[in-house]
Swiss-Prot record:
Gene3D superfamilies, per the entry: Ribosomal protein L25, beta domain, Ribosomal Protein L25, Chain P
UniProt record similarity statement: Belongs to the bacterial ribosomal protein bL25 family. CTC subfamily.
Tagged with keyword RNA-binding: yes
Source organism of this protein record: Frankia casuarinae (strain DSM 45818 / CECT 9043 / HFP020203 / CcI3)
Function: This is one of the proteins that binds to the 5S RNA in the ribosome where it forms part of the central protuberance.
A Gene Ontology BP annotation from the UniProt entry: translation
Any matching Pfam family: Ribosomal_TL5_C
GO cellular component, one term: cytosolic large ribosomal subunit
A Gene Ontology molecular function term of the record: 5S rRNA binding
Source species, domain of life: Bacteria
Subunit architecture: Part of the 50S ribosomal subunit; part of the 5S rRNA/L5/L18/L25 subcomplex. Contacts the 5S rRNA. Binds to the 5S rRNA independently of L5 and L18.
Name by which UniProt lists this protein: Large ribosomal subunit protein bL25
InterPro entries xrefs: Rbsml_bL25/Gln-tRNA_synth_N, Ribosomal_bL25/Gln-tRNA_synth, Ribosomal_bL25_b-dom, Ribosomal_bL25_C, Ribosomal_bL25_long, Ribosomal_L25_dom, Ribosomal_uL5_bac-type
Keywords tagged on the record: Ribonucleoprotein, Ribosomal protein, RNA-binding, rRNA-binding
Length: 210
């Protein structure tokens, strides 16, 4: 696992229309409505090219990619704080961006990726898909790998056991359960469970006919 170094330049233009109608017109023009805030500066309403934003988020860093925004007044570094997508189409609806500076520590939700094969009798239950990590804004880690090779039922992996790259630190409950290993149901247990279903149904029918 290595720190995510992806950085993408993207042109931003000021937005002059607000509200739902203005946002719809912005999206129809192939742009994504966004708000840029942080560092004590007043919020700035901007629009970003949807195609460029999609390309940026397809890097290894995902939505944690460092964006260099090209504004009329100069460039700014920013990270996506909240990404809203259309529930059906998946297209971008709105983006909240937070200003960052090189060398500044920020907290970001980093994806957790399970790798390896557990013991044959083990059923793996991944409790969380992301974990809060504090790191330099320009060196946010990529996906954090959790190796489950050979793990047996009854084993758990906690947040404090995750291996983070140098310069990164956990910003979540250290006792948070990330992965839990359960025992697979045996064939006998599955058959017994299936065998109970008709009995329960028959009992229900019998009681209903009384």
């Amino acid at each position: 696992m290595s720190a995510a170094m992806s950085e993408v330049r993207i042109a931003a233009e000021p937005r002059t229309e607000f509200g739902k109608g203005g946002a719809r017109r912005t999206r129809r023009a192939g742009k994504v409505p966004a708000v840029l805030y942080g560092h004590g500066k007043p919020p700035r309403h901007i629009a970003l090219p949807a195609h460029d934003l999609l390309h940026a988020f397809k890097t290894d860093a995902g939505t944690n990619v460092l964006l260099t925004l090209e504004l009329a007044e100069g460039t700014e570094l920013a990270l996506a704080k909240d990404v809203q997508r259309h529930p059906i189409k998946g297209s971008f609806e709105h983006i909240d961006l937070v200003l960052v500076a090189r060398g500044e520590k920020v907290v970001a939700d980093i994806p957790v990726q399970v790798i390896g094969e557990p013991h044959p009798d083990t059923l793996v239950d991944q409790q969380v898909t992301t974990i809060a990590v504090k790191a330099d804004a320009t060196r946010l880690p990529g996906p954090i790998e959790v190796d489950i090779t050979g793990l047996e039922p009854g084993t758990s992996i906690l947040a404090r056991q995750l291996v983070l790259p140098a310069g990164s630190e956990l910003d979540a409950d250290p006792d948070l359960v990330v992965v839990q290993c359960l025992a697979k149901r045996t064939n006998a247990q599955q058959e017994a469970s299936l065998g109970e279903t008709p009995v329960a149904e028959e009992a229900g029918v019998a009681s209903a006919s009384v």
